[in-house]
A protein has these predicted regions:
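Cytosolic juxtamembrane helix and N-cap/initiation of the first transmembrane helix
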Residues: 1-20
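Interfacial helix-start motif at the membrane-water boundary
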Residues: 37-55
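Juxtamembrane helix-break-helix junctions at the cytosolic face
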Residues: 57-71
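Alpha-helical membrane-associated segments of multi-pass integral membrane proteins
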Residues: 99-124
Length: 144
């Protein structure tokens, strides 16, 4: 399962999404100097999207024997990650004043890039497999 590079990409993307469950999204510094941290899992919308992204990552990594299915699920996971990144970007632009945002806000973008690279590698593997099957089939017909 872990011999193919696309499975490693998907595993790394799943680890990035899993890490977001425990990371802070932003810090609010009050007028009296108190710090309030906001974790991704505090917002229900963020939590539900992160759960969906993590399930899609694991499902894509688990479907390593079906290359087309793996590529499709990886693309879906990447689109979910891009949607989540857009949502985070809108929230950041809305609350730019008074909040300090963490670098983990870019994790969905990294996960999406890994998902799309995994989908591309999965399709390359499937095309290579189809070409080898086609070549072998042609040789067998000529030998008869």
């Amino acid at each position: 399962m872990w011999q193919r590079i696309q499975t490693l990409y998907l595993g790394l993307a799943a680890a990035i999404v899993f890490a977001m469950f425990f990371c802070t999204f932003a810090t609010i510094i009050g007028p009296d100097g108190t710090k309030i941290t906001i974790v991704y899992s505090e917002k229900i919308a963020y939590l539900s999207l992160m759960i969906m992204m993590f399930i899609a990552q694991v499902a894509a990594a688990a479907s390593f024997k079906a290359f087309f299915l793996q590529a499709r699920v990886a693309v879906i996971a990447g689109l979910l990650a891009i949607g989540f990144q857009i949502w985070l970007g809108i929230d950041i632009l809305r609350n730019l004043d008074g909040m300090s945002f963490n670098v983990t806000a870019l994790f969905p973008l990294v996960a999406a890039a890994l998902d799309f690279m995994a989908a591309q590698r999965s399709m390359v593997d499937e095309m290579t497999l189809q070409a080898v099957k086609s070549t072998r089939k042609g040789r067998r017909k000529r030998q008869k």
